[in-house]
Amino acid sequence: METNKEVALKVLKGAFIERDATVVDRYFSPDYVQHNPVIPSGSKAIANLIPTLKDLSYEIGMVVAEGDLVMVHGRYVGWGPKPLVAVDIFKVKDGKVVEHWDVMQEEVPASATASGNPMFTPA
C-alpha cells in the first residue's frame, strides 16, 4: 500500500502537472470534504476542475507527513493573474484523500521580501 505522502504527491502530480482526471477515482474518497472557499466538496468537483486547468503549471516544494496528514508547499502559475505559493493539506485514509485544506498567497519575488529570500523553493 502507498504511503500517505505518496498518495498526496500522486494526486498533485496527476491533477496539476499531468492533468490526469483518473487520479480522482484512484485517490479521492467519494465523500471527499473540501475546505477551499471556491471548490465544492465531493470528488466530482475535482474531476470537473482538472480539464479546465489548461494554462496551469505547478511545482512541488517541501513535503511533510505526520499520521494521516500530508502538507505540501507548492507554487501555482496560471491559477490567477500572479503566481501563487500555497500549502495544501491532505487527510488520507485507506489510500484515499478524504479531506483537503489550502492556504494560497500571491508570490512576492525574493527581491521584494524583507529577508531577500524567496517564498518558495522547488524540491
What are these regions (language model features)?
Residues 1-123:
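C-terminal and inter-domain tail/linker signature
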